[in-house]
A protein has these predicted regions:
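Hydrophobic/aromatic-rich structural module bridging two neighboring secondary-structure elements via a short loop
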Residues: 92-145
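Short hydrophobic/aromatic-rich beta-strand segments that constitute the beta-sheet cores
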Residues: 61, 90-92, 123-127, 262-266
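A short, structured loop/turn motif at beta-sheet edges
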Residues: 48-53, 80-89, 115-121, 225-226, ...
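Mature, soluble, non-transmembrane domains
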Residues: 128-289
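N-terminal secretory signal peptides that target proteins for export/translocation
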Residues: 1-13
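Bacterial N-terminal signal peptides
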Residues: 16-29
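N-terminal cleavable signal peptides for secretion/export
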Residues: 30-105
């Protein structure tokens, strides 16, 4: 996939958005045909995000490898998570400049906001994606999951419609909490469904591989992470269609116990981008909660 604006450019750009969601929280079983093993199932949470923290993180993005149309790519991503006592408020700004073999210079920008209840049952979302200042797509609406794990999403944009969410679908912060919980108990993999509001097609399949959990082996990039256990995480994203055998995109990262990541490796097929933590601020927990 490529950064050049094309009919599937919105879908391609969704991979960058998913990368950012996994930082905060970064989106059921994966397709059995694609993954013969049986990953640990997950279910809708009651309140699983208590270990996560508010944060303001700035990442530098650079091209790590290219075998396709992308000649160069750089950018930055700002991610802000606020603890509002009963919910998590997130804001993300992503700005990527690239050069392609046949498309010249391209500037891809996204602005994304969510409000996710801490019980994992309600999500309000809005995503605006642009290429060279032209709006590619706006996705907005809200989603709800009941106590039994049955969910529904009501889109306002790009068109008004209602979709059912598969049982067990997790929202972004709950998805991250599930990853961290699995890492801490030593699970080798999990495969929860994710709905993050970055696209108009409902939930995605995710397959998550977890490697090692404990004191970081590599130096940490921020003093705020010095005493946090961490582990390596690899996430593959799949469309929920019968022919989706290969992932749409993949992300590797080092996750800390508080939900912060300081190293990213984003694989989009014909090129890879590396993300490094430039600065991190962890605000104190609200005393009135």
């Amino acid at each position: 996939m490529s950064l050049i604006p094309r009919p599937d450019g919105v879908r391609s750009f969704r991979g960058y958005l998913a990368s950012a969601f996994l930082l905060s929280a970064l989106p059921s079983a994966c397709l059995a045909a694609a993954h013969p093993s049986s990953p640990t199932p997950t279910s809708a949470p009651t309140n699983t995000t208590s270990a996560l923290v508010g944060q303001r993180a700035l990442y530098d993005l650079s091209l790590a490898e290219s075998g396709g149309n992308t000649l160069s790519a750089t950018g930055n991503m700002t991610y802000v998570v606020r603890d509002t006592c009963s919910a998590w408020s997130t804001q993300q700004h992503l700005d990527i400049q690239s050069a392609t073999r046949n498309g010249g210079a391209v500037n891809m920008v996204s602005d994304y906001t969510t409000l996710e209840s801490k019980d994992g049952r309600h999500l309000v979302f809005r995503t605006v994606q642009k290429s060279n200042d032209a709006v590619l797509q706006v996705v907005s609406g809200e989603a709800n999951v009941d106590a039994q794990g049955h969910g529904v999403v009501q889109y306002e944009k790009p068109i008004k419609k209602t979709l059912k969410l598969p049982d067990g679908t997790l929202f972004p912060m709950a998805h991250t909490a599930a990853i961290l919980a699995a890492a801490q108990r030593g699970a080798p993999n999990i495969a929860p469904l994710l709905f993050d509001g970055t696209g108009p097609d409902g939930a995605q399949e995710t397959y998550i591989t977890l490697l090692g959990w404990g004191p970081p082996k590599d130096p940490v990039t921020s003093p705020a992470l010095a005493n946090q256990p961490a582990g390596r995480v690899h996430v593959a994203f799949f469309s929920r269609t019968p022919d989706s055998i290969l992932p749409d995109y993949e992300i590797g990262m080092r996750y800390f116990a508080n939900g912060v990541s300081d190293m990213l490796d984003m694989d989009f097929g014909d090129f890879r981008m590396r993300g490094t933590l430039h600065s991190l601020t962890l605000p104190p927990r609200a005393a009135h909660c």
